[in-house]
Amino acid sequence: MSVRHSGIGMTSPRTRVRMVERLREQGVRDEVVLAAMGSIPRHLFVEEALASRAYEDVALPINYGQTISSPWIVGRMSELLRNGGNNSLRKVLEIGTGCGYQTAVLAKIANEVYSIERIGPLLTRTRIRLRELGIRNIYLKHADGMRGLLEAGPFDGIMMTAVIPEIPETLLEQLAMGGRMVFPKGNRQQYLCVIDHTTEGFVETILDEVMFVPILPGTINR
């Protein structure tokens, strides 16, 4: 089974360059993140019928009621996780693998990436896609992301790619001292937030207004 498709026209390397230039204009400043996003063929992470729109600044459907986040969201969340390079990101946990694009970006800016996806068939396709791209520092697991991945923690960074009303205590316990969590929080009204694990405890900062699909418990096998 292969999930590759061709990259021509609006999926050319020049299109990635223009995407990165647009991200700079939109305020993404971290050159490590921009280089990572410029090196990854985003069009390979969407259905072929949508490949020509892959570099537009929009979220796109990826089946199973899920979406691939817009380039700006991916850049913004990745930049926040790196925290200006102050977070070393030796080990990162991603909750919500989805199509794997954000996962691939994380693999470029972190030493090890552990990613959890609740939808089994979606994870199978993503696993193949990442393998075909030669990305090896990613560990994927089919599981309920609400529980995190205690056996692999603690993590220098945790990223959640679906909105949640409140962060469960079990996830906070998996954030290393000095680490940072980036996630969308809310219900109808949603905000991008960060939680820093400091010597004084967990410090939450509310940032941009956003819109994400909700996180759901349990797993889907077919």
From Swiss-Prot:
Domain of life: Bacteria
Catalyzed chemical reaction(s): [protein]-L-isoaspartate + S-adenosyl-L-methionine = [protein]-L-isoaspartate alpha-methyl ester + S-adenosyl-L-homocysteine
Residues of the active site: 69
SUPFAM superfamilies in UniProt: S-adenosyl-L-methionine-dependent methyltransferases (SSF53335)
Enzyme class, spelled out: transferase
Family membership noted in the UniProt record: Belongs to the methyltransferase superfamily. L-isoaspartyl/D-aspartyl protein methyltransferase family.
Protein name as annotated: Protein-L-isoaspartate O-methyltransferase
Lineage: Bacteria, Pseudomonadati, Pseudomonadota, Betaproteobacteria, Nitrosomonadales
